[in-house]
């Protein structure tokens, strides 16, 4: 499951994000995006046709997962427990992305680990390609293989 920020960094040519996306594609790893990620990416008001095409090209290497009732209810559960158990306000888009990752048993690739780290106790696996860039390859593959 790829978070919005990784795609934004990929489009900007940021090395760690570009590397992570290339690794996912080259190693034929199943890639998922939530429809909320698609909405966030296309909601920038000044996107050119070329930028829209690049976004679509990145999204086309994976599968877009719709927000259905299961995802919505899991997201609601995550938001409630985030507030109740951790006194954290989990934004709805983040809750949807996390819920989708959990329901798919997928690793969430994000730079915003801080927003999600409390959900590790509830089974969410996170990978930040910006951490320890020098040994990314080994850590990335082992993290994905654990699931």
Spans of features found by a protein language model:
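Acidic catalytic patch
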Residues: 63-84
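Short active-site oxyanion
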Residues: 27-31, 61-63, 102-107
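Generic structural signal for small/hydrophobic residues in well-ordered secondary structure
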Residues: 3-4, 41, 75, 101, ...
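Acidic, PIN/NYN-like endoribonuclease modules and their adjacent C-terminal/linker elements
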Residues: 98, 102-147
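Donor nucleotide-sugar recognition loop
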Residues: 86-93
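Short, well-structured N-terminal submotif of metal-dependent ribonuclease cores
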Residues: 1-33, 43-56, 135, 143-147
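Alpha-helix capping/helix-boundary segments
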Residues: 6-7, 37, 71, 96-97, ...
């Amino acid at each position: 499951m790829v978070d919005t920020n990784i795609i934004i960094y990929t489009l900007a040519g940021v090395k760690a994000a570009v590397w992570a996306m290339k690794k996912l594609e080259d190693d034929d790893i199943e890639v998922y995006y939530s429809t909320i990620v698609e909405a966030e990416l296309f909601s920038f008001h000044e996107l050119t046709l070329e930028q829209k095409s690049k976004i679509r090209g990145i999204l086309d290497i994976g599968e877009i997962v719709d927000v259905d009732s299961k995802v919505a209810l899991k997201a609601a559960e995550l938001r409630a427990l985030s507030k109740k158990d951790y006194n954290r306000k989990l934004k709805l888009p983040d809750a949807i992305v996390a819920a989708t990752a959990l329901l798919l048993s997928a690793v969430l690739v994000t730079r915003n680990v801080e927003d999600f780290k409390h959900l590790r106790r509830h089974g969410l696996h996170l990978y930040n390609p910006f951490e320890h860039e020098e040994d990314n390859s080994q850590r990335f593959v082992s993290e994905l293989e654990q699931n």
